Regions:
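ATP-dependent carboxylate-amine ligase
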Residues: 29-34, 40-203
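Extended acidic/charged loop-beta regions that coordinate divalent cations
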Residues: 1-24, 67
């Protein structure tokens, strides 16, 4: 059976769509166009097991975002997105595509990605260029992701420490913008999220 999203609405709080051929609506309270595909796969599996989709689809509303996986954290003025659980070129491109749909200013904070092999520098440079082409306003890179800064060009801010990254990104949040933080688990990019969260609480 072919399953597709007939109408999709991708907002800052989640992804809503009408699912074809079933004609039922569903919403996942997690962000990103790729989440619509994940919802389709889940419902196709449920349908194959004989479960009533009119009952199953609304259950998508109860999904709780996993920390570190496009988890939206509202700040007083801006929006912080914790996508630090892991990273590869494909997931970074998906994150960039979502961030590009947000109002300016938009800042991507990118850490190192592991296991990219001999093409690592080329792949990471291309991600920086991709962020530039998508209209991302600022790219902040941590050690291991410096090649992305070179690919991005003007507006890239390579830094050495988590504190520096958080300090630069805080300006975007103060102006009501969106900051998305991403990197491999080994890059410990959740440290940037924690610092930005603490700043928002006035610590």
């Amino acid at each position: 059976m072919e399953a597709r999203a007939g109408r999709a609405c991708l907002g800052g709080a989640g992804a809503a769509c009408r699912l074809q051929p079933w004609g039922v609506g569903g919403c996942r309270p997690v962000v990103g166009a790729h989440q619509v595909g994940n919802a389709l796969l889940a419902l196709a599996a449920v349908q194959a097991l004989g479960v009533d989709l009119a009952e199953a689809a609304p259950r998508l509303n109860t999904l709780k975002p996993v920390p570190g996986r496009m988890n939206v954290i509202a700040r007083d003025r801006g929006t912080l997105v914790d996508d630090t659980y892991n990273a590869n070129p494909g997931s970074v491109r998906a994150a960039i595509a979502w961030l590009a749909g947000r109002p300016s200013p938009r800042t991507l904070v990118l850490g190192a990605m592991g296991e990219l092999g001999p093409s690592a520098e080329t792949l990471v440079t291309e991600l920086g260029a991709n962020a530039r082409a998508a209209g991302i306003d600022t790219l902040i890179t941590l050690p291991g992701a410096e090649a992305a800064a070179r690919g991005f060009g003007d507006g890239a801010e390579p830094v050495e420490h988590f504190d520096q990254a958080a300090e630069r990104a805080a300006g975007t949040l103060a102006r009501g913008g969106t900051v998305l933080v991403k990197g491999s688990r080994s890059a410990r990019m959740e440290q940037v999220v924690q610092r930005l969260t603490d700043k928002g609480r006035g610590h």
